[in-house]
């Protein structure tokens, strides 16, 4: 007999009075004085569990069923019947229950049926998927990943894998993880007593990627519409609820596109993701709303129904300088916006999702297209209430002389970008793109404020367990 999932039963794909097999784990169990046990079993296919009715005439009732505790894995054969208390719900009347895995010493089981804080669960990343809250986050994450691919595929985008190991510093920052096979006790030095990277595995300095953007630009300049989707790494020594050392990004590049084109695409991508989550994960969203006491569904619907508010960087600075709020960092033109500035604009001033455009060139990456004023670049950041920046994008500098000027101004090593310069030397084309941080998006959708709760195995400063 082929086993069925609980989601199939709930969605009425399996009909009553039919003998079925299910596999799952015990959530809770209670025994009645009449010799009947009520076992709530879940299998992860949905938030809901199914109640299993186990009677004392089962051969292993005393030896096994009465000993069941939260977390035990079971295989159950039985007949589906409508609940006497609620005719819309099915119960499984067991004819056979096999215990596949016991919980050794239930009193020491870290993920018992009692409530646990999210902070506590972070110490048990390998076991926390067994909780309702992390199960809901996982299903939502899955739908978000699926919809990213589905949306872009329907728009004619081609997926291009970008390298994890790179010799490039895409963002021009020093916060990169170095990749090396050197024995720390025997690091070779050159004649200047500096590390001799020529003797390393790749013959040069290499890093874990902070972005796949530069690589997929080369494919956009021949395939027109491309994207990459994978993990990225930042060696930021920031032990906050907003930062991860390893996180997932979807990065999109489009040939012949301008800034407004990618802003519209980014908004439509987010809208479609939210629609899909509302459609596929409604029960999980309702559960999270009650658990966290926040209004998630209304928030997602508001984004879908309201257009992005466009704000020039200069206007954002004016608003922040003239407001009565005392910020930790006092702003002036030419400074980057911190999270407190972003949150003020999206949460308090506009009370909506916004996009800030045309930033000073000094605070943005070397590859962004210089505007006519020679002071700003054609860049845009989309901010969401409660989160801040969720998407960052720009027109890419397609003029070789301007690109060279910015490489020099940012004090980057010119020879490392020769291949990138080739894209401007041989049939250069206007193009634009953006990056979307998936974990921040999941944090927004689920309402979980700590980004470490929305990725299976979080990596951060001083934390690389599991």
Curated annotation (Swiss-Prot):
Asked if the record carries the keyword Nucleotide-binding, the reply is: yes
Annotated GO CC locations = cytoplasm
The enzyme class is ligase
Cross-referenced CDD domains, in alphabetical order?
A: AsxRS_core, EcAsnRS_like_N
Which Gene Ontology terms describe the biological processes this protein takes part in?
Answer: asparaginyl-tRNA aminoacylation
The EC number(s) this enzyme carries: 6.1.1.22
* Key word Aminoacyl-tRNA synthetase present: yes
- Please name the Pfam families in this protein's record: tRNA-synt_2, tRNA_anti-codon
InterPro entries, from UniProt?
Aa-tRNA-synt_II (IPR004364), aa-tRNA-synth_II (IPR006195), aa-tRNA-synth_II/BPL/LPL (IPR045864), Asn-tRNA-ligase (IPR004522), Asp/Asn-tRNA-synth_IIb (IPR002312), NA-bd_OB-fold (IPR012340), NA-bd_OB_tRNA (IPR004365)
* One annotated GO molecular function: asparagine-tRNA ligase activity
* Assembly behavior: Homodimer.
Q: Which family does it belong to?
A: Belongs to the class-II aminoacyl-tRNA synthetase family.
Family matches, as PANTHER family: ASPARAGINE--TRNA LIGASE, MITOCHONDRIAL-RELATED, ASPARTYL/LYSYL-TRNA SYNTHETASE
Q: What is the name listed in the Swiss-Prot or TrEMBL entry for this protein?
A: Asparagine--tRNA ligase
């Amino acid at each position: 007999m082929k086993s069925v999932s609980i989601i199939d039963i709930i969605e009425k794909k399996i009909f009553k009075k039919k003998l079925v097999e299910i596999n799952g784990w015990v959530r809770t169990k209670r025994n009645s004085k009449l010799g009947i046990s009520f076992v709530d079993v879940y299998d992860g296919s949905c938030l809901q569990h199914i109640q299993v009715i186990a009677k004392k005439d089962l051969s292993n009732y005393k030896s096994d069923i009465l000993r069941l505790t939260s977390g035990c894995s079971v295989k159950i054969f039985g007949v589906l019947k409508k609940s006497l208390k609620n005719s819309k719900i099915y119960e499984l009347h067991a004819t056979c229950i096999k215990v596949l895995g016991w919980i050794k010493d239930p009193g020491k089981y870290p993920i018992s049926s009692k409530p646990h804080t999210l902070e506590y669960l972070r110490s048990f990343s390998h076991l926390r998927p067994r909780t309702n809250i992390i199960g809901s986050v996982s299903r939502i994450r899955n739908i978000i990943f699926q919809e990213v691919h589905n949306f872009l595929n329907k728009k004619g985008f081609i997926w291009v894998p970008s390298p994890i190991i790179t010799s490039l510093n895409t963002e021009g920052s020093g916060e990169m993880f170095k990749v090396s096979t050197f024995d720390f006790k025997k690091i070779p030095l050159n004649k200047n007593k500096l590390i001799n990277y020529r003797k390393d595995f790749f013959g040069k300095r290499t890093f874990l990627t902070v972005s796949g953007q530069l690589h997929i630009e080369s494919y956009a300049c021949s395939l027109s519409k491309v994207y990459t989707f994978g993990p990225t790494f930042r060696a930021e020594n920031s032990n906050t609820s907003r930062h991860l050392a390893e996180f997932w990004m979807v990065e999109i590049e489009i040939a012949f596109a301008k800034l407004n084109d990618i802003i519209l695409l980014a908004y439509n991508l987010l809208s479609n993701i939210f629609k899909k989550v509302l459609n596929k994960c409604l029960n999980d969203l309702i559960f999270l709303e009650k658990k966290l006491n926040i209004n998630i569904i209304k928030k997602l619907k508001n984004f879908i129904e309201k257009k992005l508010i466009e704000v020039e960087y200069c206007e954002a600075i004016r608003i922040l300088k003239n407001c009565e709020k005392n910020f930790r960092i006092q702003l002036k033109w030419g400074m980057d916006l911190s999270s407190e500035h972003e949150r003020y604009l999206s949460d308090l001033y506009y009370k909506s999702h916004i996009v800030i455009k045309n930033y000073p060139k000094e605070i943005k990456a070397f590859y962004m297209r210089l505007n006519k004023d020679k002071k700003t670049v054609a860049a845009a950041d989309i901010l969401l209430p409660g989160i801040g920046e969720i998407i960052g994008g720009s027109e890419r500098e397609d003029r070789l002389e301007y690109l060279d000027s910015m490489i020099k101004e940012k004090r980057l090593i010119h020879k490392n970008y020769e291949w990138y310069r080739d894209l401007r030397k041989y049939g250069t084309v206007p193009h634009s793109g953006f990056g979307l941080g998936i974990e921040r998006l999941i944090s927004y959708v689920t309402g979980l404020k700590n980004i470490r709760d929305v990725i299976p195995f979080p990596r951060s400063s001083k934390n690389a367990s599991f």
